[in-house]
Amino acid sequence: MDAVATAYLGGAVALIVGVAFVWLLYRSLDGSPHQSALAPLAIIPVFAGLSYVGMAYDIGTVIVNGNQIVGLRYIDWLVTTPILVGYVGYAAGASRRSIIGVMVADALMIAVGAGAVVTDGTLKWALFGVSSIFHLSLFAYLYVIFPRVVPDVPEQIGLFNLLKNHIGLLWLAYPLVWLFGPAGIGEATAAGVALTYVFLDVLAKVPYVYFFYARRRVFMHSESPPAPEQATVEATAAD
């Protein structure tokens, strides 16, 4: 087993820690209306961990048009990263429409980026450009739309800012790794890119679910403060 496969298995083991944090969070929220809503956080470390086990054995790694794509990596990202950004919106108290919007933007960024991996020439860079547009729209949700609706509750503001900046900083790194790797300008090796992605994925997902556990007091109230737009709807209905 080579260094990359070993790193993949190491990443899978590290993600078990994330599963433990979600389990502890779920147990600590017994009786809270947020308990069931936060349960899908488990998908993040579980799906990513299983994907890494598959990647370690080259499952889903294929050649398309002469270009290698680690299929399970993109399937993992397509499943888990929309959940990551969606729960940032949930922590902000954003509307369901906004949460779905940021999740769709993230999913399209990943899907179009995968298309850029298996194409060449002008089409590759056109797809990279489209993926970058979805990337920028995702940042608009994180840094413009969501901050407008966070209730004036210090604990909730603190959790939102922590999640927002954690995801925001890491989401800047991923396209740079892609750009310098074999799929982009080819300045980094496939092995180097693979090892970097393992590091980024574990760093993105395990601390993320830990933050929810560490700041679980936010979700222990009978109900969280409504977002401004929700409050407006409720006030209008009452009138």
Swiss-Prot record:
Segments on the Cytoplasmic face: 26-34, 93-95, 151-153, 223-239
Keywords: Cell membrane, Chromophore, Membrane, Photoreceptor protein, Receptor, Retinal protein, Sensory transduction, Transmembrane, Transmembrane helix
Modified residues (N6-(retinylidene)lysine): K205
Pfam family, one: Bac_rhodopsin
Compartmental location: Cell membrane
Record's keyword annotation contains Cell membrane: yes
Any one GO biological process: phototransduction
GO cellular component, one term: plasma membrane
GO molecular function: monoatomic ion channel activity; photoreceptor activity
Topological type in the membrane: Multi-pass membrane protein
Transmembrane segments: 4-25, 35-56, 71-92, 96-118, 123-150, 154-181, 190-222
Residue intervals on the Extracellular side: 1-3, 57-70, 119-122, 182-189
Keyword Transmembrane helix assigned: yes
PANTHER family: BACTERIORHODOPSIN _OPSIN, NOPA (EUROFUNG), PTHR28286
Function of the molecule: Involved in the control of phototaxis. Mediates both photoattractant (in the orange light) and photophobic (in the near UV light) responses. The signal is then transmitted to the sensory rhodopsin I transducer (HTR-I).
Family: Belongs to the archaeal/bacterial/fungal opsin family.
Name of the featured protein: Sensory rhodopsin-1
